[in-house]
Every structure is written in C-alpha cells, then in structure tokens.
Design a protein with these regions (language model features):
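Basic, helix-initiating cap at the start of DNA-binding domains
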Residues: 1-48, 52, 63
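Hydrophobic/aromatic residues within well-ordered alpha-helical segments
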Residues: 18, 61, 68, 72, ...
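Short amphipathic alpha-helical segment with a characteristic S/N-K-E followed by hydrophobic residues
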Residues: 21-22, 37, 60-66, 75-76, ...
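Hydrophobic alpha-helical connector segments
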Residues: 77-106, 159
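Helix-loop "lid/cap" segments that line or gate small-molecule binding pockets
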Residues: 94-100, 108-117, 171, 189-195
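Amphipathic alpha-helical packing segments from all-alpha helical-bundle domains
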Residues: 98-106, 110, 120-146, 157
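Hydrophobic/aromatic-rich alpha-helical bundle segments in the mid-to-C-terminal region
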Residues: 123, 127, 131, 145-191, ...
Length: 201
C-alpha cells in the first residue's frame, strides 16, 4: 500500500486502515502547519485517499482533527484509578499534561478556539470529548465523597471545575511560567483537596 506525501510518494510502514492514515495525517499536518493551515485537501494529498471518501465520514477538517485528538488523548492519557482520589487525579492529570505539552496541545488550542464560533464543532467537543471524560472524573469525586476524602455536601461538578479550570487556563492562555508541569499539577491537586477535606482531617 502506498501513501502520497506532498512532493513525493512513500511506501507505508506496515498495515494501516484508511481511518488510521487519515488520523495520522491530520496530526502530522496539524503539527507542521498549525490548525489554520489544515485542510481536507491537504489530508487527502498526504494519504492518497479521495476527498469524497473522507467527507463520507467527516463533514469538515475540524471534525477530522477532533477525532484524531480524541483518539490520541484516549491513548496517551487514560483515566487512572489509584488508591485514593487525590492520587487518581494527580496521575490522570499528569498524563494529560504530558500529552498537552506535546503535539496534541499545539493542535488542540486553536481547535477549542474555533469551537467557540462553530456550533457544530462545539457540540461535538462537548459530547464526544468533554462529557465522557468528565463523567468518569465525576464518578471519582463521588467515590471520594463516599470514602470521606472530601467533605460531605460538595457538588462534584464544582470540584471538577476547581481542578480542571486552572489546568485548561494554562493550556489556553499563554503567560510566563504557565506550563502544565508535573509540579504544577501536584500543587493544584494538593491545594484543591486540602481545601475540601472534612474538618479535622
């Protein structure tokens, strides 16, 4: 099987489905050109797959990139389950932070920005990306409430906003020393959990 690349044709390494080829090309081109430079035509040229074939599954380049990012984040940063919720969130967020410090973050920032003005893309991000991961995190908070790691009566969604709000602020708003580092994640989780522990803990 052969894959066309701009200016040349290269033999593909190992078996790869059309979906995998499209996902890989979207991530590679997103890293090379940035989100604004991505086009369905470019992905078609990189993969040698007809645009009509691509459009049968994805309506636009934003949908392709979102799918590619979703697969990547699921692979690179699966939800972690550890002995305590504090440890689980620290481990999960460190994996996510590592992914966002690389290619994924470079592509995801403009994608999330575009979603604010694109209702279809925004809904896709919410239903396919945010809600599935948030639901898993919500369950982790509920377990923490049941095990008295967190004080009773807390709203799980508010706890998640306290944890992930600063995380995504650093992803989307560039400022000096605003890196999503392991040290930042450790300090963030410790600060949130220390402030929400039952009295006397």
């Amino acid at each position: 099987m052969w894959i066309k690349s701009p200016g040349k044709v290269v033999q593909q390494r190992g078996p790869e489905t059309r979906t995998q080829a499209i996902r890989r090309a979207a991530l590679e081109l997103g890293e090379e050109l940035g989100f604004d430079g991505l086009t369905t035509e470019g992905i078609a040229a990189r993969t040698g797959i007809a645009k009509t074939t691509i459009y049968r599954r994805w309506p636009n380049v934003g949908a392709i990139v979102m799918y590619a990012c979703l697969v990547d984040v699921t692979r690179l940063a699966p939800i972690q389950t550890r002995a305590t919720a504090r440890e689980s969130f620290t481990a999960s967020m460190r994996l996510l932070g590592k992914a966002y410090r690389g290619r994924l973050g470079k592509i995801l920032r403009p994608l999330l920005g575009r979603a604010q003005a694109d209702e279809n893309l925004r809904e896709a991000v919410r239903t396919r990306w945010v809600e599935p991961r948030r639901q898993a995190a919500r369950e982790a908070v509920r377990r923490a409430l049941q095990s008295d790691e967190l004080r009773a009566g807390l709203d799980p969604d508010v706890v998640l906003d306290a944890l992930y709000g600063p995380f995504y602020h650093r992803l989307l708003v560039p400022y000096k020393n605003g890196v999503i580092s392991d040290a930042f994640i450790h300090a963030l989780v410790e600060t949130v959990f220390s402030g929400l522990e039952p009295s006397g803990t």
